[in-house]
Amino acid sequence: MIKFKFLLWVLAQLLQRKINSNPDCARYVDGKRLTFQIRTAAGAGRYYVVENGKVRSSSGLTDSAQFTLSFVNAHKGFEILSAKDAQPAFLRGVGSKDLVISGNFLEVLWFQGLTEFLQPPKVIDSLDRTAF
């Protein structure tokens, strides 16, 4: 449970750092107003507000979330959110019912686009570089 809660707290810090350091990420969130939450079925979680080019988070849950990611338990939540293969892990979680998404799915897709900024840049091997 502690690792899950820590990961949720760190998520907001990482997103804000990326917004501050990456102009493309800053443009992506510019003008966006979104409230969402990530939680467990037992009720532990955190909610996030994206507004005015900033991300802030608070412990607990909110009634005004535009979407909610609900994990069956903290262990599964940590496993899915910290997976190296993020998108396939997310889809496996939805398929196995370890993750339930409720709310506005367009906002979920927007959020997935935001989390793409957290991925390390793809390194192209010198042998893979071709003119075509």
Task: Label every PLM stretch briefly.
Residues M1-F132:
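Feature captures hydrophobic
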